[in-house]
């Protein structure tokens, strides 16, 4: 039996972090957590790209452009969508979630969903470092692990086959 899994060694990995300015009180804390996690695990400053966008819906366009560039080992999408008085919350939360899932199905680059969808600002702040850990930090760990898993899957399954065809 072969078991393949990623690890938390970030040396040499190129990671993009997409973060909206909307709900900056929360998203800035998520970004701090993500950057802390990446750097603690060896991802160097020069290999981290932070892309600031207006709001969470703009992440869909930004993800497509970053994937087209083909230079990142993983992409983290952060955000805070907080329920308001209108249906807008449902639209934004559903569309960004569907888009990330779709990109993950159709891309070779892991995209990590670090968008908080909460009923209140307090819940969002709690998940951005106040009481329930920092989901940005957690997203960084997932990005590193998945980027390494991607590399290991290629190495273990693609490279042996390409050598045998020569």
Curated annotation (Swiss-Prot):
Keywords per UniProt: Riboflavin biosynthesis, Transferase
NCBIfam families: lumazine-synth (TIGR00114)
Recorded family membership: Belongs to the DMRL synthase family.
Protein's name in the database: 6,7-dimethyl-8-ribityllumazine synthase
Residues the entry annotates as binding (2S)-2-hydroxy-3-oxobutyl phosphate: 85-86, 127
Pathway per the UniProt entry: Cofactor biosynthesis; riboflavin biosynthesis; riboflavin from 2-hydroxy-3-oxobutyl phosphate and 5-amino-6-(D-ribitylamino)uracil: step 1/2
Enzyme Commission identifier(s): 2.5.1.78
Gene Ontology BP annotations: riboflavin biosynthetic process
Job of this protein: Catalyzes the formation of 6,7-dimethyl-8-ribityllumazine by condensation of 5-amino-6-(D-ribitylamino)uracil with 3,4-dihydroxy-2-butanone 4-phosphate. This is the penultimate step in the biosynthesis of riboflavin.
Chain positions recorded as 5-amino-6-(D-ribitylamino)uracil binding sites: 22, 56-58, 80-82, 113
Entry GO MF terms: 6,7-dimethyl-8-ribityllumazine synthase activity
A GO cellular component annotation in the UniProt record: cytosol
HAMAP family membership: Lumazine_synth (MF_00178)
Reaction equation(s) it catalyzes: (2S)-2-hydroxy-3-oxobutyl phosphate + 5-amino-6-(D-ribitylamino)uracil = 6,7-dimethyl-8-(1-D-ribityl)lumazine + phosphate + 2 H2O + H(+)
Active-site residues, record numbering mapped to chain: 88 (proton donor)
InterPro entries, A to Z: LS, LS/RS, LS/RS_sf
SUPFAM superfamilies: Lumazine synthase
């Amino acid at each position: 039996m072969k078991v393949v899994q990623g690890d938390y060694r970030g040396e040499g990995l190129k990671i993009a972090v997409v973060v909206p300015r909307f709900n900056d009180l929360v998203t800035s804390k998520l970004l701090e957590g993500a950057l802390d996690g990446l750097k603690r695990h060896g991802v160097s400053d020069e290999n981290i790209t932070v892309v600031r966008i207006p709001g969470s819906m703009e992440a869909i366009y930004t993800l497509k452009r970053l994937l087209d560039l083909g230079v990142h080992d993983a992409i983290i999408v952060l955000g805070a969508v907080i329920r308001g008085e209108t249906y807008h919350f449902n639209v934004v939360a559903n569309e960004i979630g569907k888009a990330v899932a779709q990109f993950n199905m159709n891309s070779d680059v892991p995209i990590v969903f670090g968008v908080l969808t909460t009923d209140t600002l307090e819940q969002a702040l709690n998940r951005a470092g106040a009481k329930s850990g920092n989901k940005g930090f957690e997203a960084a760990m997932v990005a590193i692990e998945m980027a390494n898993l991607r590399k290991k899957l290629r190495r273990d399954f693609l490279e042996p086959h390409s050598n045998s065809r020569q």
